[in-house]
């Protein structure tokens, strides 16, 4: 055991190769010092070490396969490892006796001069991670970046021992330095994932935009449909309003036509007299101007009637009738101003009847004084109401007025209404109608006496207040006279005054009380 030499301590950053053959060669290269020795102990330790490393390698491979099967997203890691593992195929160890420091370190180097970081085709490399509790495999945590500050001299020393760049340590595959301290550039790793995320975002945005456009088109179609419906409704309402207006105009036109038929014969007679009086007042120049204007209006109206529709004709007829009515009303006002008898001439025959004929005979403009005198003589008074009427109307009024004055309102008898349908009704009918009670004479108004007595009481109360304020005795003042009310009745037994109805109840009671015999005296025992 004294001559036993332990194997140099392996560094933590040893990377196991992908192929088992390479691993076997590596292990054999590692354990050359033990095999060269002739002692059986060294050979047994070497075999144990190799078997242990083989078991460890198989376990790590199984774990990696499980991770890949459970998380398909990590296939990228296998790709990166396949790209990177061939570079570590030719691993050798410095076996010279002079370079003892190299054997003590036990560092492995690549057989080919590969750079420290892989090329651009290794962008998809993502290092493996061991299973941990509480870590989501689908959404791994963001790795922690711990950059080591290696000097250029150290790297040069490590790399110049064999002239080859150093392999990365196994700590670079640890969970604390996930992804960013690996052989692959992190910006190159993030680019495909970012592209996928951006493509997915663009796809979702495009679908949302398409949905919004479809919704907008559907809204526009709905708005157009509603606009069409509203326009149709407006057209229907406009047509209905126009139809109603036409019906109204036709009704007005028919009414005016009927009025024109009724008024036309009267107006012909009246217009003849009015035209003569009106033209006599006008000068010849004005008369010719008015005649030419009326003639032009008639010609234009005839042309309009020929070329226009029935509705336009009705409008023209309405305007013409209105103008004629205004002329008639002006003529009536002028006739009233000229004389009172003209008003009787313009009254309609339906209202006056025979009276209009009698008044029209005496209603000539030349006999205005005689007509007023005859009207005064014909007036007579009604015997019932005392109003004055014409002799022609007085008889009719007197008959109606006599009926109104003679008819009295039937008084409602509540006792008969209650007794109706009972045996008491026969008794009331046999008894006959109740005799009307004699109405009491009307009372005389005594408001002045009441007012004077009220003023006297107020003055007496004011005097009493003044005496009390001075500190005197109010009993020294003369007593106020009792208020004299002539309506009140004095009781003969107690000499008090009561209202008439109250006195009727009080006097018999007071009489019985006063006429009672005195109570018997009590004999004291």
UniProtKB/Swiss-Prot annotation:
Polar residues bias spans: 36-48, 301-312
Residues engaged in binding Zn(2+) 2: 491, 494, 506, 510
Binding site for Zn(2+) 1: 382, 385, 397, 401
Zinc listed as a keyword: yes
InterPro entries: Znf_C2HC_C3H, ZNF_C2HC_dom_1C
Zinc finger (C2HC/C3H-type): 378-407, 487-516
MF GO annotations: zinc ion binding
Keyword terms of this UniProt record: Coiled coil, Metal-binding, Repeat, Zinc, Zinc-finger
Coiled coil: 207-252
Domain of life: Eukaryota
Cofactor(s) annotated in UniProt: Zn(2+)
Gene3D superfamilies in alphabetical order: Classic Zinc Finger
Basic and acidic residues bias: start-end ranges: 23-34
A Pfam family assignment: zf-C2HC_2
Ranges of compositional bias, category Low complexity: 90-102, 359-373
Keyword Protease belongs to the record: no
Region (Disordered): 23-48, 85-107, 145-171, 292-316, 330-349, 356-379
PANTHER family: ZINC FINGER C2HC DOMAIN-CONTAINING PROTEIN 1C (PTHR14649:SF1)
Similarity annotation: Belongs to the ZC2HC1 family.
This protein's name: Zinc finger C2HC domain-containing protein 1C
Organism: Rattus norvegicus
Organism lineage: Eukaryota, Metazoa, Chordata, Craniata, Vertebrata
